[in-house]
Amino acid sequence: MKRVRTEQVQVAVSCYLKRRQYVDSEGPLKQGLRLSQTPEEMAANLTVQSESGCANAVSAAPCQAEPQQYEVQFGRLRSFLTDSDSQYSREVMPLLYPLFVYLHLNLVQSGPKSTVESFYSRFHGMFLQNASQKDVIEQLQTTQTIQDILSNFQLRAFLDNKYVVRLQEDSYNYLIRYLQSDNNTALCKVLAVHIHLDVQPAKRTDYQLYASGGSSRTENSSLEPPEVPSPILQNEAALEVLQESIKRVKDGPPSLTTICFYAFYNTEQLLNTAEISSDSKLLAAGFDNSCIKLWSLRSKKLKSEPHHVDTSRIRLACDTLEEEENEEDNTGTEMKILRGHCGPVYSTRFLADSSGLLSCSEDMSIRYWDLGSFTNTVLYQGHAYPVWDVDISPFSLYFASGSHDRTARLWSFDRTYPLRIYAGHLADVDCVKFHPNSNYLATGSTDKTVRLWSAQQGNSVRLFTGHRGPVLSLSFSPNGKYLASAGEDQRLKLWDLASGTLFKELRGHTDSITSLAFSPDSGLIASASMDNSVRVWDIRSTCCNTPADGSSGELVGVYTGQMSNVLSVQFMACNLLLVTGITQENQEH
């Protein structure tokens, strides 16, 4: 009864399809649905599914090429692979042997004799060095007709079987891009009909790499060459190429830095110092009239945060504590004036996050300015004479100062007294600088020496002598290996901190050097001088050629402009060199 009902359903469906004018609708219904498969049929279906795909479909369209094009296309592929030094070209190179054999056999079957001889004589020499290939190549020379091919067991095996070539997925894509770039119909036909490309996945696990060591060749793939495992995995080879490229960049000539110059015009009061914040958003300048001027270098104006306590006023019980709104604080301005010192301001330093500013003055004090409210929040006192310079440690945990009292002092932001006193110089401490690891502090003095101190112990660990005048500027290389010093003797000296000896002496300036800065990669150093020039030096250079002006051979660039005084140089993280200076008074805007 169940069978009759199934037949009734099929008849009803067939009638419906006929009314809808579907062609050959009875065939599939009469065949019925097969619910079982033999193991042989299942294996055949799985093989078809695994073998069919874009990896093995090099050319889906029928390809026909003139016999004369065989030589042109094969020669073009050989030149493409041999001229390239990439890893992909080396992996595709074994494909040339089966391509040559099959192209030659196709020419024997369909091409004129002159074309066959020309093709063989031009390319057969590149395969004679391989012993396993030499025998087949020599047999091709005596093959002139189809009967010669059929009578030769090895050549007939080439036509009866597909030659297997294993390629990595990246190398396979490399080959496909080449085949699509020009007319390669003869090559595409051979690849589609006679060659099986076994494409390996690009990424494999360690277990898969271990498991793939066994042979998976079948009886029909007896022509497949033995697979030689690569001694270097693909990712290791790529890493070596990357490291070699990085080494060539490091050892190569440096790229000249871009210089951005900030000029000060109409400085009625004498300008002593200028510095730019690490994020290039703020510019601070200290003047002889005791004030500090702060500029915004971006479109955003300087706006004070609301503060709820006014310490300059005494509130009475009957007063209403209403905030007095300042229109300037609400809208913001491009410049703020910070007042608090009672003497010339000699140095300023921004915190790493630009949230605060330190300044030192002739009034023997150091002041901390909150850049949120633009007010002086802390006063540090301890020096007995004017303070010439301040510097902040890399993580803004400590700061140091140098003074006319011949000492340098270590401070913390939450203490108004010094934590350490570094005594040992015989004259003023003109400049101070923290090492990148914050464990050491360098000081330069009018006594013509540079000292390196242990920041925690407070003792001197290095003494560098050799300058012929006061030392006015110091700078550590970011890698922590070198210390640069310069001053009134017009010489820039590089000291090796590990050995405590002089590494290089750079000459070229004609006046006192006032500022130094290392590039982020420690390969370049910039120096600013009172001779109104900025010079950039390559400290990695070993060139002994001296320029005509007598400068050191390490000089790679000189910047001179309409300046009367260069105040400072600073390298940014993007290899941008920021320079601040005063323009000549006769220079117009």
From Swiss-Prot:
Record GO cellular component, one term: transcription factor TFTC complex
Record keyword rRNA processing present: no
WD-type repeats, residues: 266-305, 340-379, 382-421, 424-463, 466-505, 508-547
One GO BP: regulation of somatic stem cell population maintenance
Cellular localisation: Nucleus
SMART domains: WD40
Top-level taxonomic group: Eukaryota
Keyword hit for Nucleus: yes
A GO term for molecular function: transcription coactivator activity
Keyword field: Nucleus, Repeat, Transcription, Transcription regulation, WD repeat
The family this protein is said to belong to: Belongs to the WD repeat TAF5 family.
Quaternary data: The PCAF complex is composed of a number of TBP-associated factors (TAFS), such as TAF5, TAF5L, TAF6, TAF6L, TAF9, TAF10 and TAF12, PCAF, and also PCAF-associated factors (PAFs), such as TADA2L/ADA2, TADA3L/ADA3 and SPT3. Component of the STAGA transcription coactivator-HAT complex, at least composed of SUPT3H, GCN5L2, TAF5L, TAF6L, SUPT7L, TADA3L, TAD1L, TAF10, TAF12, TRRAP and TAF9.
Free-text function comment from the UniProt entry: Functions as a component of the PCAF complex. The PCAF complex is capable of efficiently acetylating histones in a nucleosomal context. The PCAF complex could be considered as the human version of the yeast SAGA complex. With TAF6L, acts as an epigenetic regulator essential for somatic reprogramming. Regulates target genes through H3K9ac deposition and MYC recruitment which trigger MYC regulatory network to orchestrate gene expression programs to control embryonic stem cell state.
Protein name (Swiss-Prot/TrEMBL): TAF5-like RNA polymerase II p300/CBP-associated factor-associated factor 65 kDa subunit 5L
Species of origin: Mus musculus
Gene name tied to this protein: Taf5l
